[in-house]
């Protein structure tokens, strides 16, 4: 069995299977909030500046995940910068998703885990890229 498993080739680009859908979700959410208005911020009872950072943070994090992956794709394209952009984008995603979960005012941690699956998955996706960067 060990020999069989060793014959299966590694797929070093598998991080794109997580990177692209996560980036697309955040780019879509960011674009949907533009133009940023105070009325939209008031719907969620947020200050305008927080709403502005959320909108452009979502857009920037999505673009950063794609850009960071491209920058780290080759040694000629400054791989350390790609890693840094990927980590920052993952951190941004984690911060935004923490805020989204927090605004929902869950009664308990268990309620978040059981009923807020989508946001939890996005949070863990951001955490993955914040911790691993482009070294996947």
Named regions from a protein language model:
Residues 1-35, 52-136:
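Extended, low-polarity transmembrane helix blocks
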Residues 34-48:
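Membrane-interface interhelical connector segments
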